[in-house]
């Protein structure tokens, strides 16, 4: 990746093969998330895992992922600590439709002082209506969408606008949390909404 000018690396285990198209693919568990981060960190220091020198060393800015809303919640913070120790510099979070859980997660990171070592980047998803909310709730591992979030959009006379306003509220709340330094925005709308969000967020 470094040879092609790619310096930002987000290291993650990923979903189980049963969540993809090739459900009978072989699972590979040689490395977990923190171990993969440690491999990248070692390479960036100019060494292979064997200790042999790597010259020139790749320039890598290494990140990790975590789900702030999935139990067990205390374990999630412990995993972040392991990833920071392994060398992660940014933490991209799974989309959370539970502001209270996201806030508790971020405060837990700050209480351990990890926010001084890693940038927290929550995910925000721009959608046009209720269908993506139901899809994520039913089909995407690790995502739990509260019924009140679904109902607010579904019962609106203008689902597209209500979905946007709700997303804006989630984004504003996320940016107000301690340790948060930005947002990862996924845009399923493919219109001018992303520009509107950036403008509304200031």
List where the protein language model places each region:
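C-terminal/domain-terminus segments
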Residues: 177, 185-202
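Active-site pocket-lining/capping segments in soluble small-molecule metabolic enzymes
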Residues: 14, 27-55, 65-70, 112-170, ...
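Short, acidic/polar
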Residues: 72-83, 164-174
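Catalytic beta/alpha-barrel core
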Residues: 89-98, 182-187
């Amino acid at each position: 990746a470094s040879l092609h000018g790619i310096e930002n690396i987000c290291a993650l285990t990923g979903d189980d093969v049963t969540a993809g198209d090739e459900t009978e693919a072989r699972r590979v568990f040689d490395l977990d998330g923190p171990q993969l981060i440690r491999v990248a960190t070692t390479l960036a220091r100019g060494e292979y895992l064997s200790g042999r020198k790597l010259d020139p060393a790749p320039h890598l800015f290494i990140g990790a992922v975590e789900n702030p809303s999935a139990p067990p919640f205390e374990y999630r913070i412990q995993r972040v600590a392991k990833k920071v120790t392994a060398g992660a510099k940014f933490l991209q979070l799974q989309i959370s439709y539970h502001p209270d859980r996201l806030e508790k997660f971020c405060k837990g990171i700050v209480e351990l002082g990890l926010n001084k070592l890693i940038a927290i980047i929550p995910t925000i998803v721009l959608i046009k209506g209720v269908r993506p909310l139901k899809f994520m709730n039913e089909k995407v591992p690790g995502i739990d969408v509260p019924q009140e979030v679904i109902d607010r959009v579904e019962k609106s006379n203008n689902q597209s606008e209500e979905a946007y306003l709700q997303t804006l509220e989630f984004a504003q709340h996320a940016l107000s949390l301690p340790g948060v330094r930005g947002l990862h925005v996924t845009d399923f709308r493919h219109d001018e909404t992303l520009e509107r969000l950036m403008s509304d967020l200031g």
